[in-house]
């Protein structure tokens, strides 16, 4: 498994618990898009996990915050190298990235409240300590699913069953979890000539 963590904020830092103790892991912390590209080419077909802040265009790179280099660590530019592998995409609006690229397969978060500012922006009354605790619990739950080799298609339902859904922002986060399978192009068969059906 390849793990990419863009660890530039306190809430993103909590996501290191997702891969803690996972065996046979290639870890890239704050990589450039080129570094991600190189590792994807070296390890075709290997599951890729991406974590941090993002949008429907991809996982935001450290360079977005510094103003030096491309703003995206994983995004449209990598799409050909993302198609033939399973993905675990944990960033805000990762599901939008998958919607734009229907050939992708994996587990995707939607908007995911991970700090007090995001909670306020979406009208939730929640404190940073509680939010950080919930992010940590989410990371630990995902870690367990990885170690148990649970099929990605089962993740959303399992995670919802473990969450404190009575908290409005937690329910918002977990309701947005999705598994997306590949959308295969329909193979339109030529109709058989008359009289060939027996």
What are these regions (language model features)?
Residues 86-198:
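Active-site-proximal C-terminal subdomain of hydrolase catalytic domains
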Residues 20-21, 41-45, 78-82, 98-109:
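Short, surface-exposed basic-aromatic patches at helix termini and helix-loop junctions that form
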Residues 32, 72-75, 151:
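A diffuse structural propensity rather than consistent per-protein peaks
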Residues 9-14, 32-35, 53-62, 93-97, ...:
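Short acidic, S/G/P-rich loop/turn micro-motifs used as interaction or catalytic elements
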Residues 55-83:
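A short, glycine/acidic-enriched catalytic loop
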Residues 22-24, 45-48, 67-69, 106-110, ...:
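Short, low-complexity, polar/charged sequence segments that are solvent-exposed and flexible
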Residues 1-51, 86-90:
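A domain-level signal for caspase-like cysteine endopeptidase catalytic cores
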